[in-house]
């Protein structure tokens, strides 16, 4: 099918790449920016056809391979990531399509299990991923950058770059050889900006940032479990403050639901046990049960039940539950009682009522084994 792209005035992939790079450099200059936008859009549209083909003709594998090599040689992916928010609307869409296709492109007879663009980013240009994250600083680039990031996040090495990078703008991004999983983060890296983007962004930006944030935290479980264990205090301080207590209903509800998913995932058992030891975390969850909005109450319930179902509650958690026993026993039977078709929810409420009834009169020090759980007990606190 290569003839489709070589007939007439069509140019070689390397020519298109160099032309786009030159136009991107001119786009930075206010005096020429408006003049190059149309030509840049045309060039990106042509590149999209090279990687995507048309309904009538498939893209040429050899031509896509040549295009990828030229883009890597000219560092065009980085330049596109930096400039994405300045591109015209259609050009942003085309850039998103180009990125998404080449991120998963594998040449015939390739030896690496990962696509070459992913390997290149990880070993040579992780700054591409960091700049795509920074696309959330601009409403124009938020959604295309988010779509590209979620395609890249299918690979755990990309998640590691986002989680562990602490570079400032203009500095080199982290390499995998520099990752120190046991060293707590300072809260200055790009990952921590997601809390701001989700909490303070426009509705569309916030929603897209949350989707990417959730992908980072739920897709590669072994990576994230270690990260949360090392950065537990700072992460959940940010999560509880900016997301669970967000003024946005959508952010609040989605964040509580995500919190429940994280805590009830077997891979995060140790993280869950640390979270439910905290009396302050329990107070926050009990506050959610009294929210004016039923879906916030419902999602809050699925976090609250983890505290109550834990057979080895901390003294702080026991004290709060014991002090509020009578009120909880009056409150829970009537809690969301209109959910008559949800048998599991009804059974869980009954279970929690029974657990609260069985609480001792005074807190009892939990066993040492509860504070140092083994993997064999990983599901003892989950309410079915």
Swiss-Prot record:
InterPro entries: ARM-like (IPR011989), ARM-type_fold (IPR016024), Mo25 (IPR013878). Belongs to the Mo25 family. Keywords: Cytoplasm. Residues 362-384 are annotated as: Disordered. Residues 362-374 have a biased composition (Basic and acidic residues). One of its GO terms (cellular component) is cell division site. This is Conidiophore development protein hymA. The gene is hymA.
């Amino acid at each position: 099918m290569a003839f489709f792209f070589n007939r007439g005035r069509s140019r070689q992939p390397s020519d298109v790449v160099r032309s786009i790079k030159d136009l991107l450099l001119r786009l930075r200059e206010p005096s020429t920016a408006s003049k190059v936008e149309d030509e840049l859009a045309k060039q990106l549209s042509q590149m999209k056809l090279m990687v995507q083909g048309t309904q009538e003709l498939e893209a040429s594998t050899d031509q896509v391979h040549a295009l990828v090599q030229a883009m890597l040689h000219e560092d065009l992916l980085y330049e596109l990531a930096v400039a994405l928010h300045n591109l015209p609307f259609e050009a942003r869409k085309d850039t998103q399509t180009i990125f998404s296709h080449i991120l998963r492109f594998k040449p015939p007879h390739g030896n690496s299990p990962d696509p070459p663009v992913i390997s290149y980013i990880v070993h040579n240009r992780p700054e591409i991923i960091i700049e795509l994250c920074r696309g959330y600083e601009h409403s124009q680039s938020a959604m295309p950058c988010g779509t590209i990031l979620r395609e890249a996040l299918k690979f755990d090495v990309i998640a590691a770059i986002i989680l562990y990078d602490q570079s400032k703008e203009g500095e080199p991004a982290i390499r995998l050889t520099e990752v120190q999983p046991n060293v707590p983060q300072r809260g200055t890296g790009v990952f921590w900006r997601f809390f701001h983007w989700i909490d303070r962004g426009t509705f569309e930006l916030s929603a897209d940032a949350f989707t990417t944030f959730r992908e980072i935290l739920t897709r590669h479980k072994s990576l994230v479990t270690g990260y949360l264990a090392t950065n537990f205090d700072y992460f959940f301080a940010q999560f509880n403050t900016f997301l669970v207590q967000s003024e946005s209903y959508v952010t609040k509800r989605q964040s509580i639901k995500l919190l429940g998913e994280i805590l009830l995932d077997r891979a995060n058992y140790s993280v869950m046990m640390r979270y439910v030891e905290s009396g302050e975390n329990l107070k926050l969850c009990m506050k959610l049960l009294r929210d004016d909005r039923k879906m916030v109450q419902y999602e809050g319930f699925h976090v609250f039940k983890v505290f109550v179902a834990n057979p080895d509650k901390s003294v702080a958690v026991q004290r709060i539950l014991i002090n509020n026993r009578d009120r909880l026993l009056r409150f829970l039977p009537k809690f969301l009682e209109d959910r008559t078709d949800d048998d599991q929810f009804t059974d869980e409420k009954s279970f929690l009522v029974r657990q609260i009834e069985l609480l001792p009169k005074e807190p009892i020090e939990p066993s040492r084994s509860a504070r140092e759980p083994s993997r064999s007990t990983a599901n003892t606190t989950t309410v079915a």
